[in-house]
């Protein structure tokens, strides 16, 4: 467990300080009080109530059917039991279609206990980000493979190869300029993710983006080796197999992120 775990709850400013200190951030998804309590007590710094719940909890084929009401329900359940982890919640599909809609959804999530909201994509979403930040709502930007864009991408594929890598760098910097406090990079080649992480003043959290990010996140079902009904991505590792219990798996995952042993080349994408 990190030294921060023994001191005080995580805050948004503490995330930036962790990056300056070179301390890796450990993030996991959670959707209910039971798992959230266990994760919080065993070294997880940030908990994400992700719209991934559409697939791993509700049994859908994608995140698209998830509603703001779904997100609020699960966010509130998780928030009730957290003592130290910072709680991030996703804006669901099209909840961020306009700044006004995003503000309404984000307000509901913060009232339910979230401390930051996550928005997928850049481009026109930058106006949404600025609108929320100007109204004192912390924002995390999700770049690379954005699951809400699965139809446009034609499936779950690595993003940021070749010239697309330069656009990803520009998008990340634009998101920081718009005021985000955190960036998630998903399914991005290791060199590009490392370069982006080195260039930005805010922390990056990788998922299939290599060890050069400032932290890592996994969907809890993947970290525990549970069958989600979908193909296992390359970046997934079953920590329950070596941890022996849920708490042990979380501790093993947290330690591997902090000491840099996860992700290794086997669980990342080359350029």
Curated annotation (Swiss-Prot):
Free-text remark on how the cofactor is bound: Binds 1 Mg(2+) ion per subunit.
Similarity annotation: Belongs to the PanB family.
Annotated residues for binding of 3-methyl-2-oxobutanoate: 51-52, 90, 118
Pathways per UniProt: Cofactor biosynthesis; (R)-pantothenate biosynthesis; (R)-pantoate from 3-methyl-2-oxobutanoate: step 1/2
Protein name per UniProt: 3-methyl-2-oxobutanoate hydroxymethyltransferase
Binding site for Mg(2+): 51, 90, 120
Active site residues per record: 186 (proton acceptor)
Lineage top rank: taxon: Bacteria
GO cellular component, one term: cytoplasm
EC category: transferase
Major location category of this protein: cytoplasm
Cofactor field: Mg(2+)
Record-listed E.C. numbers: 2.1.2.11
GO MF entries: 3-methyl-2-oxobutanoate hydroxymethyltransferase activity; magnesium ion binding
Stated role: Catalyzes the reversible reaction in which hydroxymethyl group from 5,10-methylenetetrahydrofolate is transferred onto alpha-ketoisovalerate to form ketopantoate.
CDD domains associated with the record: KPHMT-like
Record organism: Xanthomonas campestris pv. campestris (strain B100)
Keyword match Thylakoid: no
